[in-house]
Structure formats: C-alpha cells, structure tokens
Amino acid sequence: MGNCNACVRPDSKESKPSSKPKKPNRDRKLNPFAGDFTRSPAPIRVLKDVIPMSNQTQISDKYILGRELGRGEFGITYLCTDRETHEALACKSISKRKLRTAVDIEDVRREVAIMSTLPEHPNVVKLKASYEDNENVHLVMELCEGGELFDRIVARGHYTERAAAAVARTIAEVVMMCHSNGVMHRDLKPENFLFANKKENSPLKAIDFGLSVFFKPGDKFTEIVGSPYYMAPEVLKRDYGPGVDVWSAGVIIYILLCGVPPFWAETEQGVALAILRGVLDFKRDPWPQISESAKSLVKQMLDPDPTKRLTAQQVLAHPWIQNAKKAPNVPLGDIVRSRLKQFSMMNRFKKKVLRVIAEHLSIQEVEVIKNMFSLMDDDKDGKITYPELKAGLQKVGSQLGEPEIKMLMEVADVDGNGFLDYGEFVAVIIHLQKIENDELFKLAFMFFDKDGSTYIELDELREALADELGEPDASVLSDIMREVDTDKDGRINYDEFVTMMKAGTDWRKASRQYSRERFKSLSINLMKDGSLHLHDALTGQTVPV
C-alpha cells in the first residue's frame, strides 16, 4: 500500500457537514498508539539475540528469498526456496527496528518457542527454522497457498452441514493438540486457518501463534487479547484459561453453519455487551434446517460460564463431531455462502483500511503522552501511584471525582501491583480523552476516496477490494455497500466508514500496542457502566480487581 494520493475537497452541493472529514493536522493531533511508548525513536539501537537459539548461519546460505507474500505490523512474509531441496516455503522476516518495546520482543520469543515446542501436526503450520541477523528475525515455515477457510467454502458450489462438521472437527483437533501440550492459542478465527495448497483434499492449517501463551492447569490470565467477534466473556473480565479457545472455535462453527457471527453490534463496546449477554439466535435461516446435534454442540461451546463449557476433548467426543461423515448432506443454501462471502470480503476491506492506518502511525505524536507521564511521575521512578495520578489529573484540568479516579486506577492496573507503569498509563489517557483515532480514520478515508468527493463510491470500493484473487463479484460489492451505506444514497460517507471500522475490527492488524490499549479502555468502560457486574449476576462469577 502506498501513500495517500488524494485529498478531500469540499463539495457544497453533495457533502453533508457531519460526513465530511477535515484535512488532518499532523502537528497538533495526539496519537498515543504508535510504536515506542518507552523510549525516544532515535537513535535506534541494534537488538541482539532476540531469538537466542536461532541458527548462527545466514539465512541466505540455505534459502533464497523470493517475492513478497504479505505484510504485517512488524515485517514482511516472502516466498522462500530451499537451495538444496527446492522446497517452496514461507519466510516471515520481522524487522528488529520495529520491535520497540519489551512486550514486542517477548511476543516474538514466545511465538518461536511455542511453534518449536508443539509436535508436528497435519493441521498446524510447521516452523522449519529461525535465523537472526542485525536487521531481522527470519522465521522459515510451511507455505500455505490454498487460501483462507471462508474463501474456499465460498468457491465451492455445494456447501453442506456435513462439510461444516468436517471443518469443525479439524479446528477442535487443533485446539485439543495445543491444550494437551500446554499452549493456549488466544486468537482463533477463520483468517488464522489456511489451506496448504489449492487441491480439493488440501489439509487445513492453523497459523499465527503470535498471541499464544504457555499455560499450566489452574493458571489464570488477565491480558485482554484476541479479535472482538471471537472473544470469550471471561477475557473481557480479565480472568481466563484455555476455555477461551473452545469459545472462539464455537464462534467459528456458528459462522460456518449460518454465515454470520453470533455476537454482533455496530461498535466494539456493543460487540462486547452482546458477548456478555450470550444470547444465541437459532431462529433465522438456515438454523431451522440444521440438526439439533449441531445446535447442541454450539450451545455447549458458547456457554458463558467457562466452568460449564465443554473442553476441547469433550468437543471431539460430541456426537456431531464423532459422526461428522454422517451429518446431513443437504445444502445449507445460497444464503450461507453469500453471507460467508460478504463476511470474508468485508474483513478484507477492513484489513486494507488497517494497512493504511498502520502506515500513518507516527512515533513523534507519542511525545505528548510521554511528557504527561513525566509530569505526573513526581519522584521519577517510572511508575505512577494513586496520589500521583489524582494530583496529576488535577494539574491537567481533569474534572473526575475521587471514585472515578479510583476505578480508573483499579481497572488500568492490570498486574495489580498498586501503581501504573507506562503502558497502563496510556490506557488511562485513551479512556479519558476518548481517543478513537479519528485522525487516522480520516487519513484512511482519504486514501480510498480517490476522487476527493468526500464519498467512497462503488468503483472506489471495487478498486479497494481488488487483489491477487481478482475482481470481487458485483453481488458481494452490492452487499457490502448495502450494509455500510446506512442512508441508502449509494455511496459510503465518512460517518458510515467510521461506523464500519468500529464494529468488530481486529486492531492488531494495525498495531498490537494500539489493540492492547483499546481493549484496556474497553474494559474500563464496561466496568464503569456496570456491564461486567451484570454478567457476574447472570453467571455467578466475579471480576478480579
């Protein structure tokens, strides 16, 4: 993706005042979500031994790096060929310059450790080798070139409950294998399952262990991670274990069977509230035609009480999974394939928006928050106590009362040590200033609004969605336009664009740090409005503080 090459021009005839994004001022606007929250961006020191056990030889001695396959926050994935065997592989080259915090480095180390620890499995992408030089960490792994799960389903002309059961079994086996080896994936979603090749009988492979963690029985975790649609209620409550993977797998199976997520809303907080309520819709098509056995499994995988939810082993023992080959072979209908196609294409559009946003995350804008942290940290020990937070908020003109400040302190202090480190402080600032990163939304909107009309029109949407898979078909474009274009004028204005991006977006695609801080802010909001306590009353559980 390149730089924004179009500017928004006023159109007095067409544009509405509320829908027209103003040209951003990069010098004034605050953006706390970019890059390095703990040190100045220059000079950049060279990290050594990010992966201590990596190969000491150069990657070029064994492999030839070819064309680019994809691009993420920290690096680029290339086609990679073994010099001796000529085997085609993938190499994820992670830029060490972009590993700006200790958390970033630990994420990479843990991902490599987990992929190295997991035994070889036909449905998990295999890490072949890791290399490290002055500029990059290189992870050489199996190549998956068969496309994403939903794209394959949509491409087939015939889609049945039996086919969905076969995919569900594979996903459950992956979860079972991970859990039996002490690994919690924490980010199961359709995009993280790819087909190895384009053959009809290609194995499905789980990828992306970047948010995975090792666990022991009884361990509890508090960090809010994952993707909004697939997040278990106990993740939002910051008290969870491996049952979150079963929940996420249950969400995927629900989508496989009907084409839409079970918990949906127009905002991130709305999605979270739907998850906490846990009400499943089994009434609209095609659910009346789906077997009771399938519905039974989904209900038990999406039980909001993790102590009552099925384990991965119990999922595999469920009759619907055990008898997957005997599941009804009646087509689920064009409506499911159409919904899956739209869901997949909408995700692709959001990913392109996130790519644009990622390219505009500016390190320099973080200085304002760094200065605020320094101002409040009276004794300069790198942490902020409750008295310092209270006094500091008064210094910057906050009108919050003592009860609200105490609640902010309790929720933002994720590790419970009684003070806020820099990362926890950023979450407080996001919440207080209600920063939804409108500046970055405006930049992204301008990128897709090629003619500067202050609208994204059908041709511009088509261009945005065209990729290596070719032109999107007209019906999918119409469906996306119909969903996003709420005022039904045949085009997407800025407000409609922002609403789309605030519904279930995986912000980790733009920035892991931004994603983490958004979820902390979401937790603060849910705690503040009593939503988590409502969920406690329904399930009999409590939220740790």
From Swiss-Prot:
Residues 327-357 are annotated as: Autoinhibitory domain. Induction: By drought and high-slat stress, but not by low-temperature, heat stress or abscisic acid treatment. The keyword Kinase applies. A lipid is attached at G2 (N-myristoyl glycine). The active site is at D187. It is found in: Membrane. Gene3D superfamilies: EF-hand, Phosphorylase Kinase, domain 1, Transferase(Phosphotransferase) domain 1. Ca(2+) 4 binds at D485, D487, D489, R491, E496. Residues 364-399, 400-435, 436-471, 472-507 form the EF-hand domain. Ca(2+) 3 binds at D449, D451, S453, Y455, E460. It catalyses: L-seryl-[protein] + ATP = O-phospho-L-seryl-[protein] + ADP + H(+); L-threonyl-[protein] + ATP = O-phospho-L-threonyl-[protein] + ADP + H(+). The modification Phosphoserine is found at S227. It comes from the Eukaryota. Its main location: membrane. Keywords: ATP-binding, Calcium, Kinase, Lipoprotein, Membrane, Metal-binding, Myristate, Nucleotide-binding, Phosphoprotein, Repeat, Serine/threonine-protein kinase, Transferase. GO terms for molecular function: ATP binding; calcium ion binding; protein kinase activity; protein serine kinase activity; protein serine/threonine kinase activity. Residues 63-321 form the Protein kinase domain. Residues 1-36 are annotated as: Disordered. Belongs to the protein kinase superfamily. Ser/Thr protein kinase family. CDPK subfamily. May play a role in signal transduction pathways that involve calcium as a second messenger. May be a positive regulator controlling stress signal transduction. There are 3 contiguous domains conserved in the CDPK subfamily: a kinase domain, an autoinhibitory (junction) domain and a calmodulin-like domain. The autoinhibitory domain (327-357) inactivates kinase activity under calcium-free conditions. This is Calcium-dependent protein kinase 10. It comes from Arabidopsis thaliana (Mouse-ear cress). The lineage of its organism: Eukaryota, Viridiplantae, Streptophyta, Embryophyta, Tracheophyta.
